Amino acid sequence: MSHAVKIYDTCIGCTQCVRACPLDVLEMVPWDGCKAGQIASSPRTEDCVGCKRCETACPTDFLSIRVYLGDETSRSMGLAY
């Protein structure tokens, strides 16, 4: 089952979320917006099972990665009208 995975620009490039994902949904890509020079990316969201291990692993105060399940996607990402 596919879930929406949102990476926020508060990502510090630490790779914790990538290492925590049991299905390799995430990867790091080059990005000049942080000191690490990389940011998490979610190219394989169709493989996401919604375990949210990536969220748990994120060390930032404001979670830099969020997994949205079903109807939660529309409400939480501001997509509901």
Swiss-Prot record:
GO terms for cellular component: photosystem I; plasma membrane-derived thylakoid membrane. One of its GO terms (molecular function) is oxidoreductase activity. Its cofactor is [4Fe-4S] cluster. It comes from Prochlorococcus marinus (strain MIT 9301). The cyanobacterial PSI reaction center is composed of one copy each of PsaA,B,C,D,E,F,I,J,K,L,M and X, and forms trimeric complexes. This is Photosystem I iron-sulfur center. Binds 2 [4Fe-4S] clusters. Cluster 2 is most probably the spectroscopically characterized electron acceptor FA and cluster 1 is most probably FB. The keyword Electron transport applies. It comes from the Bacteria. One of its GO terms (biological process) is photosynthetic electron transport in photosystem I. Residues 2-31, 37-68 form the 4Fe-4S ferredoxin-type domain. Its EC number is 1.97.1.12. It is found in: Cellular thylakoid membrane. Pfam families: Fer4_7. [4Fe-4S] cluster 2 binds at residues 21, 48, 51, 54. [4Fe-4S] cluster 1 binds at residues 11, 14, 17, 58. It is a peripheral membrane protein. SUPFAM superfamilies: 4Fe-4S ferredoxins. It catalyses: reduced [plastocyanin] + hnu + oxidized [2Fe-2S]-[ferredoxin] = oxidized [plastocyanin] + reduced [2Fe-2S]-[ferredoxin]. Keywords: 4Fe-4S, Electron transport, Iron, Iron-sulfur, Membrane, Metal-binding, Oxidoreductase, Photosynthesis, Photosystem I, Repeat, Thylakoid, Transport.
